[in-house]
Amino acid sequence: MRLKLGISTCPNDTYIYEALVQGLENSPFEWDVHFADVQTLNEMVRRGELDVAKVSAQVYPKIEAEYACLSCGGAIGYGCGPLLLSSVGNAFCPEKPVVLPGADTTAALLFKFWHKKTGQTEQKIEYALFDQVYRSLRSKEAVQGVVIHEHRFTWKRDGLYLLQDLGAFWEENTGTPIPLGIAVARKSLGVNTIFQIEDEIRKSLNIARKREKLVTPFIDKLAQIDDPNVMEAHIRMFVNDFSEEVGERGRASLGYLWTLVKG
């Protein structure tokens, strides 16, 4: 069976899915792989263009009629949330726009969760692709923005300022891990096929865990940042037991998030 798979180029995704993409032994599937940033993947799934994808957890209520949330292959964890950064200093500026990495991203929802909980005034929001958010902060074109992925590890060396760890704020206020991303599969594939897809993802992850090195040429080639230490830190932070099985705590975090999305 040939299926369309969508994942990002971030090291945690390419680490988990590399063996699957390159072809597992005796696999019933062949994959047409689409690499894109998470907001683009969210939009592709909302248009029904992918059979299987890694998307923002926030987007799921908008696609749940057509897609099943898989029990593995996502990104949930502790101490791994998006960061609200400033290019000019340590104080949040309500009068200045905040640049977010896509309207459907979990990062956008976590910012709004923090903004509402802390009683901030009405805020102007702008959207850009995640790497553009970071570039605009580095160039001081933007005063403040929310960064994700590899840029979580590079802001200090680039002279930016931390205003709020949005993941830590989520953990403190909900008591649950941070539900960043999930894997989804088209419901029309059928339950048995979806179970097979989950098995394939777990096999791929287990193969990755047995490698001597975290960063392979496949991961290095696709990463948006040319620093193997950052790639390794990224994988260690975002790939964990929740990647293999969402479990009760993971489901609790997703349920809390989806309740917020649905209002």
List the model feature ranges, each with a label.
Residues 2-22, 82-143, 150, 252-256:
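Bilobed "Venus flytrap"/periplasmic-binding protein-like clamshell domains
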Residues 4, 66-74, 97:
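A structural signal for short loop-to-beta-strand junctions that line the ligand-binding cleft
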Residues 190-260:
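Secondary-structure end/capping motifs
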Residues 26-40:
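A short beta-strand-loop structural module common to alpha/beta enzyme folds
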Residues 44-46, 137-138, 261:
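Hydrophobic residues within well-ordered alpha-helices
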Residues 11-12, 37-39, 48-61, 146-153:
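Beta->alpha turn/N-cap motifs
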